[in-house]
From Swiss-Prot:
NCBIfam families: DTMP_kinase. It comes from Synechococcus sp. (strain CC9311). GO terms for molecular function: ATP binding; dTMP kinase activity. InterPro entries: P-loop_NTPase (IPR027417), Thymidylate_kin-like_dom (IPR039430), Thymidylate_kin_CS (IPR018095), Thymidylate_kinase (IPR018094). The gene is tmk. This is Thymidylate kinase. Its EC number is 2.7.4.9. SUPFAM superfamilies: P-loop containing nucleoside triphosphate hydrolases (SSF52540). It catalyses: dTMP + ATP = dTDP + ADP. GO terms for biological process: dTDP biosynthetic process; dTTP biosynthetic process; dUDP biosynthetic process.
Length: 212
């Protein structure tokens, strides 16, 4: 079996940039078996179906915004397809998968942010993932003010436009899960390369534990 690595965090935390850094470093790190490939993916939108769901979730037509429960179920559908068509087959081939978001984002945004029932979300996680859990999740932790500053004047999607109070609840959710789910926390309000090196060091440490 391969390995599933996940980057989590609020919008503007630098996930996309760090995903690119990690995807360049990993194949040369010596951590991956020679025969393994690296599959880089994201949620929502890691499959053809997921791409359509992403558009519906983040940029819906006028007057077609999904309600909170519908939103939760659409994210679960995206994840179920993602696990079934991309992640699980890759792991079974012995490949490594690097994903921009996974189950933690649903708990943070829909559980903490929207205030939906967290036990229900946990049950949906189990169904959508068929019990699959990441080998390592990295939470990129940044102050909310920096998140807002980094996003600047770019066009916001439907979730990003929810406002500061929503983002505060989401950030609290990520913090709680980092403690409860054995995630790795990386302070991300530093220069790009410092953050990348911190992630690499954390991964080397975790990989050493896998060998024990």
């Amino acid at each position: 079996m391969g390995r599933l690595l996940v980057l989590e965090g609020i919008d503007g935390c630098g996930k996309t940039t760090q995903l690119q850094q990690l995807s360049s470093w990993l194949p040369k790190s010596g951590l991956m078996p020679d025969e393994s490939r690296l599959v880089v993916t994201r949620e929502p939108g890691g499959t053809a179906l997921g791409t359509s769901l992403r558009q519906l979730l983040l940029h819906p037509p006028q007057d077609a915004d999904p309600g909170p429960t519908a939103e939760l179920l659409l994210y679960a559908a995206d994840r179920a397809q993602h696990v079934d068509r991309v992640i699980q087959p890759a792991l079974e081939r012995g490949d490594w998968v690097l994903s921009d978001r996974f189950t933690g984002s649903t708990m943070a945004y829909q559980g903490y942010g929207r205030g939906l029932n967290r036990e229900l979300i946990t049950d949906l996680e189990r169904i959508a993932t068929r019990g699959l859990t990441p080998d390592m999740t990295v939470w990129l932790d940044i102050p909310l003010a920096l998140s807002v500053q980094r996003r600047g004047s770019r066009e916001e999607d439907r979730i990003e436009a929810e406002g500061l109070a929503f983002l505060e609840r989401v950030s609290e959710g990520f913090s709680d899960m980092c403690k409860a789910r054995d995630w790795v926390s990386v302070v991300a309000d530093r220069p790009l390369l410092e953050v990348a090196e911190a992630i690499q060091t954390a991964l080397l440490t975790r990989a050493a534990a896998w060998q024990r």
